[in-house]
Amino acid sequence: MGESVLSRLGQWISSTPLRSLDRAYEAALRIKAIEDRYFQGGSIGSNGNHGQNTSRYFQIQLRQELRQIDLSLAEFRASSVFSRLPDPEQNGSGPPFSSDKDQAKEAPVGPSENDGKDAENGRQSRDPSILEKLEFIDQVTSRYKRPAAQPRSTSPPPKSQEQPEPLTSSQPEPSDPSIKTNLAKTNLDNSNAPVASKTALLPRSILRTANQIRRELSSQAEEELLQEYRSQRTRTLVAVRFLLLLAILPLLVQIFSKHFLFGPLVDRFQPREPTILALSYEFQEKALSEFEFFKEKIEFERALHHQSPELDLESEDQLSKKAEELLQKYSRKNLEGLKNVLADVLSLLVFGWLILIGREEIEVLKSFLDRLIYGLSDSAKAFIIILFTDVFVGYHSPHGWEVLLSSLAAHLGLPENRNFIYGFIATFPVFLDTLFKYWIFRYLNRVSPSAVATYHAMND
């Protein structure tokens, strides 16, 4: 059995280059499927028939697949040092027990789940070799790589060949037709660059209006509109689902880990006979205060019934049981802070793990929030800003900060330090107020000046 495990482990290590190459090849197939289906065989983002949100969605898919190709090829090169590759002309498939390729086939490649299957139907009869896969990957990724900078000649050109530089361009136009073609192709592939970085002879609003009219008069306008709506709906579902996942999953992990993992583990090490000295100073005060209240309550009831103020055996027995009950109660509360700290750390790790693996979803979520916020009116934006500033740095905010810090200290099992709380309230809201004003002056004043004007009018 041990030899079988070692044999399979050796096969898995030796097949690592082929599996890595398969993952890169499948990612290239998915890029090719998107190009053929949505861009007529051209590069992704090379035409203007799609809306802004749809184009951004395709760019996210493209970056994801290109990153998968880069990581897989890096693994292919690194593992090839330790494993012997087969003949480059032979079949380039991985072993049967490798599931990476199957997982790549099942992964969605774009707005439609069947995009990758259309690109794979042509290769079902014969699995390509290693060289064919590498050539196909280079062919797909070449159009998304920036061309290398042309070396400049150190010798100045002859005076007879010098031409006056046009006023509308900051670089001389190359005379070689091949260089012109490469530059045109580069500009076509980089059409998703920011609009502010390009120059145009006409105002961009006129060009956008003409492009919008052309799209509306196109025979495929309804299909494009439906496809854009489906893409927008998919992005909204992804953003809302990821936002709920970020909010709910760490909370569930914190609750279940506290009650079912760390709770029994911490209670197991709790002393069987706790003492009052093991409690924190705050819990000692609460236990003694509650005990004194219970004792005075018994004395008050005895006085109402005209009984002797001295406690009898029954009353002393009640006080003894109450003392044991309070000791057990506050001993458990004394360990609640440790349970909460352990559960909070685990929930933060889960939250960080979600952020780490959901980079594409974060970009979709940012786009969704930008669209949601910028879709608000100026009055709504100003109302939200005033609400947040008044809650966190307004006149009544010190009371809220005091309650928040006291609750946080109780949650972590820490003693409530009034000096720290008052010092925090005296400094941190001031920093937040400065940060809000800087953000309004630096960012919001440039993005939405009308919202800033409405904010000042409402605030005054």
Swiss-Prot record:
It comes from the Bacteria. GO terms for cellular component: plasma membrane. Keywords: Cell inner membrane, Cell membrane, Hydrogen ion transport, Ion transport, Membrane, Transmembrane, Transmembrane helix, Transport. Required for H(+) efflux immediately after light irradiation to form a rapid H(+) concentration gradient across the thylakoid membranes. Together with PxcL, contributes to transient H(+) uptake following dark to light transition. Belongs to the CemA family. PANTHER family: CHLOROPLAST ENVELOPE MEMBRANE PROTEIN (PTHR33650:SF2), CHLOROPLAST ENVELOPE MEMBRANE PROTEIN-RELATED (PTHR33650). This is Proton extrusion protein PxcA. It comes from Synechococcus sp. (strain JA-3-3Ab).
